[in-house]
A protein has these predicted regions:
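Acidic/histidine-rich catalytic cores of soluble enzymes
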Residues: 1-60
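C-terminal accessory extensions appended to soluble enzyme cores
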Residues: 64-69, 74-129
Length: 129
């Protein structure tokens, strides 16, 4: 998994320096990527990490958001995890197994599921008109 500090391991660093030595798949962390890009866009880093997984296995990704932004409190570390996920997860057309990293655990999952279901229903209604 990529780190959440610019001075540490980006997805590209892990791919170049560890994956080629070990063959162990990379887990992409969306939240960490915001702090340690390694010069890659989110999509590029996600695709690079996904390329390390066998084609018959869905890549695992970690999804979380900043607690400081959620709470509107600049005193909280930006890397700290929020209670819930507010924004839709951008998959760039790929399938992943998503692991949520939220303080509210199962409640966060249920809330995100409701948001996705509602969004899907809205899209369905617009396209069926």
């Amino acid at each position: 998994e990529n780190d959440d500090k610019a001075s540490m391991w980006s997805t590209k660093d892990i791919y170049d320096k560890i994956y080629h030595e070990t063959g162990i798949e990379l887990v992409f962390d969306y939240h960490h990527h915001r702090f340690c890009t390694g010069g890659l866009t989110e999509q590029e880093a996600l695709e690079l990490a996904a390329s390390t997984w066998p084609p018959w296995v869905k890549p695992v990704v970690h999804v979380s958001e900043s607690r400081a932004i959620e709470q509107g409190d600049p005193k909280i570390r930006k890397q700290a995890h929020s209670d819930y996920i507010k924004k839709p997860v951008e998959s760039y057309g790929q399938n992943h197994d998503i692991m949520l990293e939220c303080k509210k655990k199962e409640l966060a999952l249920l809330q995100l599921r409701a948001q996705v279901t509602e969004r899907h229903q809205q899209i369905k209604e617009k396209t069926c008109l």
